[in-house]
């Protein structure tokens, strides 16, 4: 028990020391990106809600990696002397990670990308906004909030064939189709449906066709 208490105490002391060292290394006027928070639209039913993980893929800036709750990689990067070329400093540069400073242009682009993604999922006129909180220690937390638009749903599915020989091949496999009436008009699902039909036709010996 004493060992773990001392170990945890050392970790906390190291974390405080690392944090102070990093703060002094951050240039004036810049903020270290500490965290991205994503707030999905909880007014949407869970089975149709676009999740934080999905939204997070469209956030362009990600904070530095952490180790045992500390900015170890960032501290290692800052502690390397750029004017000295030796194995110790080279090792620090390889292990370390360059700081990710808040770039509001990238933040705006992230919000725009999130909106485009939600629209492509069938939730047209969606909204994506963000807010930035900064601290006296020159850290920044970016919070992205989303509002999914009213979903457009598939009312009817029709197939039109220029080549009548294709009809039985495609219609025979409609049970495996990803498209269902009543589902949200998700363009990512439409693309998967096109790919599925293309693969099926090629496997049947057809190569010159358009979908």
Describe each model-derived feature in a short phrase.
Residues 3-13:
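Sec-dependent signal peptide recognition
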Residues 3-4, 21-211:
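Interaction-mediating elements
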Residues 16-19:
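C-terminal motif of bacterial Sec signal peptides marking the signal peptidase cleavage site
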